[in-house]
């Protein structure tokens, strides 16, 4: 496995790297779904300890954790694995900066993207839950919590910093989802009342 990102190859490796790039998001998705980052937050574990905690195959767990190291999701020292600073900041559930649900939402669309040739020819969108990859409840839950992740991980702060509502009293938020942005705007502008 090689490091993700833009390839500097100009030969056939350029095509090979592009073709296998979805592996990286598959590794990220698995780590999020297995809650590996919560398990390794503030502690170092061997692959066997991780496998035991997950009830997983030690052999496959070791290979998986090694891939996470290559992708800089985890760090390894003397046979023990810990979160990288990015994983600790953005992939541990419960932190305001968590964006794991947003990543799950994107990976829920794999099968649809895998059929892009059909979409182009037929001119019809294929929704992820129409493919059977995820059920509608999971898709929409990941979508909504993913949008909330975006807000709490910095976008709502940017909105507050760039929109002056000091002289406004009312806000109507159409399509406001979890009201993440409205909450941030109202907290920054105490006179503001929002209807979502």
Language model feature labels by segment:
Residues 2-5, 12-33, 38-44, 52-53, ...:
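Conserved Class I S-adenosyl-L-methionine-dependent methyltransferase catalytic core
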Residues 139, 177-178:
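Preference for long, well-ordered alpha-helical segments
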Residues 167-177:
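Conserved class I S-adenosyl-L-methionine
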Residues 178-191:
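Conserved SAM-binding loop of SAM-dependent methyltransferases across substrates and taxa
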Residues 193-196:
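Conserved SAM-binding motif I beta-strand of class I
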């Amino acid at each position: 496995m090689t490091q993700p990102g833009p390839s500097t190859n100009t030969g056939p490796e350029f095509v090979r790297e592009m073709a296998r790039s979805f592996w990286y998001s598959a590794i990220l998705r698995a780590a999020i779904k297995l809650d590996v980052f919560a398990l390794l937050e503030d502690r170092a574990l061997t692959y066997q300890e991780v496998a035991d905690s997950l009830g997983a195959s030690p052999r496959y767990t070791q290979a998986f954790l090694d891939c996470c190291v290559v992708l800089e999701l985890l760090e390894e020292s003397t046979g023990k694995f810990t979160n990288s600073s990015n994983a600790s900041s953005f992939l541990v559930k419960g932190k305001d900066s968590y964006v794991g649900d947003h990543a799950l939402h994107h990976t829920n669309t794999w099968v649809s993207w895998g059929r892009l040739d059909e979409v182009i020819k037929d001119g019809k969108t294929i929704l992820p839950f129409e493919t059977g990859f995820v059920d509608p409840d999971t898709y929409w839950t990941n979508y909504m919590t993913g949008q909330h992740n975006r807000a709490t991980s910095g976008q709502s702060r940017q909105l507050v910093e760039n929109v002056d509502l000091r002289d406004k009293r009312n806000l109507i938020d159409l399509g406001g989802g979890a009201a993440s942005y409205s909450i941030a705007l109202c907290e920054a502008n105490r006179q503001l009342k929002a209807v979502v």
